[in-house]
Structure formats: structure tokens, C-alpha cells
Regions:
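A ligand-binding cleft/hinge motif common to bilobed small-molecule-binding domains
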Residues: 116-126, 189-190, 216-217, 221-242
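Bilobed "Venus flytrap"/periplasmic-binding protein-like clamshell domains
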Residues: 54, 58-82, 94, 140-213
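Bacterial N-terminal signal peptides
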Residues: 33-45
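Short helices/loops that flank or line small-molecule/ion binding pockets
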Residues: 98-112, 125, 143, 208-223
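Periplasmic-binding protein-like
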Residues: 58-63, 136-146, 238-273, 291-307
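Bacterial N-terminal signal peptides that target proteins for export
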Residues: 4-35
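An extracytoplasmic/periplasmic, membrane-proximal ligand-sensing/linker region
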Residues: 65-66, 72, 76, 271-360
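Boundary at the C-terminal end of the N-terminal hydrophobic targeting segment
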Residues: 46-50
């Protein structure tokens, strides 16, 4: 039975180079984790008696902190989701955007928490559809990308960064990350004639937690991050956070989405959406327990119903970055550059047509 519980979730990814400090879980969250294990045991007992199980729903998690930490954070919510939809839910928690993208390509993910470019690709290329979007307590429709540096000199001013980027060591997110790469590149670096991939002394690529730690510990000089993850970082690593300052922040970026495979019938997707939008909205002990779950889960306020149109801003950002890169790249001739720009525009138009349909 213990082996069954272990196998109910994806195998743990390699340990982070900067493991998160794990505070004791709130009582409500701990009870939900115990309930998740009990649910798995009961399910295993039923299957052992020869009854055919419902197919497991495989849930993929965008890597925001460590893989193990992310899985622990999501387990209570997914245990509640499992009860609501009447199916077991397993967790795939990975250490990189690329690993999650590959799992989606291999059809190993049925439902996922994604943001920006990854959600856009899942909808436009991988037959998934948006059912809900995260909300936060500040009430804003999004978050902002940040550039972080240490407070102490010498690498602590925006003017210094712009003047001599080749002296700075960069810690950034993967190329699919909106706040970790796409938005800083599009809104700050390229307008200042700096290409993130080539102008810095060195670079480290990792999660927002890893990039912030790299700067705080002197392993890098400037890091991409975002307002939501930096607030969480301040709670988990107060000593390291006290060494950091914000050099720059972006325009608002739309919050992350939850996507489900279109292969599932509409009634199943509606059931998932109904569960998410009602979660933590009720009064009393149940609502309090659910709000405790969301607080431990990146301090979410809840979820709102959404469809593929919520990805229109992400599509625009991705197309703008692709055009900027095409304009600044070296080409054999101008005709080759124009051909690339035309392909970008055609792809963008096709994406808009898919997204404006909303999904069904």
C-alpha cells in the first residue's frame, strides 16, 4: 500500500541546488495532505478488489520553486479536485519548463498549471484549452517582471547595468518564461540594445527562486524575477531577500492559467472549472481550510473562469519578441529578413484566430 501511495505521484525530480526552507504546514493543509494519502489508500483497496478504476488525471505543475516543494504545495488542492471529479489525480512536478513541455508533447499531461508562452503553446499546438485563471489578493489582473540586484555595490545600479552589461553576471529564467525572459528581453534589454543571451559576462538559467538566491549569494549580479514570486521569496528567505533590491519592473503580465486537454468531454471540463471557481469562496470551516490551502500555494486568492481568449496578451508579447529578434538578427539579405517577418505575422494571425474562438 505504501508503494501505491509513492507511485500515485510522478517520481521526484533531482534536488534543487538551492533547496527551499520548509516551514511547518498549517493544520488545515496537513489534514488535507493526510486525506490525500487516505484517498489513495482507499482507491488502491477498491482496485485490488477487481473493480476497474477511472483513468488517472495527470496534472503538470509549472516549476516555480523546487520540484518537491511545488508538488507538496499542490497536493492538498489536487486531493480536493480528485474528490470533486470522482477520479484519482496524480502530480507531475518538474525542475524546468523544458521538462514539462516534453511531458505535454508526449501526452503525459492531461491538466496543467501554466503561464504565458507555455500555456499559449499548449492551446495552439497541444490540443489543450483554458478553463480557469489564477487571482491574487491585490486584485490586479496580473503581475510584473522584475530585475533584481544586490543593494551593496558595485553591481547595484540600473545605469551601471546599461553602461557595461558585459561586466555583469546574469541569472534568468528559461526562454519560455514570460517574466523570466520574454518580457525583460522585450521591454527592457532589446530597447536598450542588449541581447540577454550574448551581452553578459556569464549566465545562470533557473527558477525564480534559484535566480534570486544566485544574486543574494553573490553567484550572479542581476536576476530576472516577478512580483508574485519575489513576495514568496521574501517569506521563505528573509535574510537573503534583505540583500536584494528592485532595479526595474515591467508592465502588467496576465496571471497563469489552468488548462485541460480538449479530448475530455465538455461536461468534464465544466466540472473542473466549477470546482476551481468555487474553491475557497464559502464561509465556515470548509472555506477556511481551502483558503489555507491557497495561502500555502503561492498565496493565491482563488480562480476565475477563463477561456483561450485570456492568452491573447501572451500571444502578442511572443509575436513582438519574435519580430524584435528578427529585426536585430544578422541575415544573408533583406529578403530573408522579410520572409521571416512574414512567417511570424502568419503564425500570429493563426494564433489569434484560435484564441478568439475561446475554446470549447
Amino acid at each position: 500500500m505504501l508503494a501505491f501511495i509513492r507511485n500515485a505521484f510522478a517520481a521526484p525530480a533531482p534536488r534543487d541546488t538551492h533547496p527551499a526552507i520548509q516551514p511547518p504546514a498549517p493544520v488545515g493543509v496537513a489534514l488535507r495532505r493526510w486525506a490525500a494519502a487516505l484517498l489513495c489508500m482507499l482507491a488502491g483497496a477498491t482496485w485490488a478488489q477487481g473493480q476497474a478504476p477511472d483513468p488517472v488525471v495527470r496534472f503538470g505543475i509549472l516549476p516555480l520553486g523546487g520540484a518537491f516543494e511545488s508538488r507538496n504545495d499542490w497536493e492538498p488542492l489536487l486531493a480536493d479536485l480528485s474528490r470533486a471529479i470522482g477520479r484519482p489525480v496524480s502530480v507531475l512536478s518538474v525542475t524546468s519548463y523544458e521538462a514539462l513541455e516534453q511531458a505535454i508533447q508526449r501526452n503525459e499531461v492531461d491538466m496543467a498549471f501554466l503561464s504565458g508562452k507555455m500555456a499559449l503553446d499548449a492551446v495552439s499546438q497541444r490540443r489543450m484549452t483554458v478553463v480557469a485563471q489564477v487571482t491574487r489578493h491585490d486584485g490586479l489582473p496580473g503581475y510584473r517582471a522584475l530585475l533584481l540586484s544586490r543593494k551593496a555595490p558595485p553591481f547595484n545600479s540600473l545605469q551601471g547595468l546599461l553602461a557595461e552589461p558585459e561586466r555583469w553576471r546574469l541569472a534568468r529564467g528559461e526562454n519560455r518564461s514570460l517574466s523570466g525572459f520574454i518580457v525583460p528581453q522585450l521591454q527592457f534589454f532589446l530597447p536598450n540594445h542588449i541581447a540577454m543571451e550574448t551581452r553578459f559576462r556569464s549566465e545562470v538559467v533557473g527558477t525564480h527562486q534559484a535566480t534570486a538566491l544566485a544574486v543574494a549569494n553573490g553567484e550572479a549580479d542581476v536576476a530576472t524575477n516577478n512580483t508574485a514570486d519575489f513576495e514568496r521569496f521574501k517569506l521563505q528567505f528573509p535574510v537573503e531577500a534583505a540583500r536584494l533590491q528592485t532595479l526595474w519592473e515591467s508592465d502588467l503580465i496576465a496571471h497563469a492559467q489552468l488548462v485541460v486537454r480538449r479530448d475530455y468531454p465538455p461536461e468534464f471540463r465544466r466540472k473542473v472549472q466549477t470546482f476551481l471557481t468555487a474553491y475557497a469562496r464559502s464561509n465556515g470551516p470548509r472555506g477556511d481550510a481551502e483558503r489555507a490551502v491557497l495561502k500555502s500555494l503561492h498565496d493565491f486568492a482563488g480562480f476565475v473562469a477563463a477561456d483561450n481568449r485570456s492568452l491573447l496578451p501572451a500571444a502578442t508579447l511572443a509575436a513582438q519578441l519574435a519580430r524584435q529578434n528578427a529585426m536585430t538578427a544578422q541575415w544573408v539579405n533583406e529578403a530573408a529578413r522579410q520572409a521571416r517577418l512574414q512567417r511570424i505575422d502568419r503564425s500570429y494571425a493563426e494564433q489569434l484566430a484560435v484564441l478568439r474562438d475561446g475554446g470549447s
